[in-house]
């Protein structure tokens, strides 16, 4: 009898453990969702460096319905236009928006600028005593379209007003090396400052800071993407080892997409 009880207990435990394993299967939160992609040439479906872009791999792996608005050469000041186009074409029928922008702002020497405009003003305040007018400093987002932070502020103000219930996700610029298209489009690698004396790092850092300013998640592709075109060994991930280490090829896009696939597991796509 004792042996029978032990055997019965074993089968009950085994069945319970197997059931728990089955119920613990994770469904990717972005599976089957509708996702808009904003960006520049690396996102642009017409760019020839790669037939399949990072968003194409995510479509294959997660059955995502992709709305792609990236246009070659665009900078952060184009995001409001892409926002308006998405709103016009799909309204609120979208689950999330991913913004991958900034490398062209660096190349065009857009000044970094500031996040806030600050002023001294009057406001009502009472704590332990009757409320009264007091003098305080107040800050508001800088909306200067001639600066990088100002452009990000303008873009995210537009996005969060247009799509207040949607997930908005930012991707930092990735590392970049030489891009030699022609005599009038000859871009040096990130080891050099741009026209306004800034390294690419400053533009990456500003996108990361935007997470705190605007309450949006940021995935740091510069750090986690794994692509480092300044090394010849990493030229395999880019369009052309001699003339284009700016645009990832299909292998490069696949690596970026794999990184994004797993990082998106930590974020809800819809609310």
Describe the residue ranges of each PLM region:
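Alpha-helical transmembrane segments and their juxtamembrane interfaces
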Residues: 12-13, 50, 177
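C-terminal segment of classical bacterial N-terminal signal peptides
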Residues: 13-19
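Residues that line or immediately flank small-molecule/substrate-binding pockets and catalytic motifs
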Residues: 8, 39, 101
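Serine-esterase "nucleophile elbow" of acetyl-processing enzymes
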Residues: 20-72, 77-93, 97, 232-233
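Alpha-helical cap/lid subdomain in secreted, periplasmic
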Residues: 61, 83-271
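Sec-dependent N-terminal signal peptides
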Residues: 4-13
């Amino acid at each position: 009898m004792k042996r029978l009880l032990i055997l019965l207990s074993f089968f009950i435990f085994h069945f319970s453990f197997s059931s728990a394993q089955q119920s613990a299967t994770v469904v990717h939160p972005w599976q089957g969702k509708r996702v808009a992609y904003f960006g520049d040439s690396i996102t642009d479906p017409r760019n020839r460096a790669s037939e399949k872009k990072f968003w194409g791999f995510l479509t294959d792996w997660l059955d995502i319905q992709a709305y792609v608005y990236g246009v070659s050469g665009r900078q952060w000041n184009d995001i409001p236009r892409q926002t308006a186009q998405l709103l016009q074409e799909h309204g609120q029928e979208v689950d999330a928006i991913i913004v991958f922008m900034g490398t062209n702002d660096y190349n065009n020497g857009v000044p970094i600028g500031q996040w806030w405009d600050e002023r001294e003003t009057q406001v009502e305040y009472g704590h332990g005593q009757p409320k009264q007018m007091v003098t305080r400093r107040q800050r508001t987002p800088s909306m200067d379209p001639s600066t990088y932070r100002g452009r990000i502020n303008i873009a995210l103000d537009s996005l969060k007003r247009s799509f207040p219930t949607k997930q908005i996700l930012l991707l930092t610029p990735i590392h970049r090396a030489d891009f030699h298209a022609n005599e009038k489009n000859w871009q040096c690698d990130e080891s050099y400052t741009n026209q306004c004396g800034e390294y690419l790092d400053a533009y990456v850092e500003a996108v990361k800071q935007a997470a705190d300013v605007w309450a949006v998640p940021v995935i740091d592709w510069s750090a986690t993407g794994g692509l480092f075109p300044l090394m010849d060994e990493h030229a395999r991930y880019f369009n052309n080892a001699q003339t284009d280490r700016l645009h990832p090829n299909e292998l490069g896009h696949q690596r970026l997409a794999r990184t994004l696939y797993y990082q998106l597991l930590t974020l809800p796509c819809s609310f």
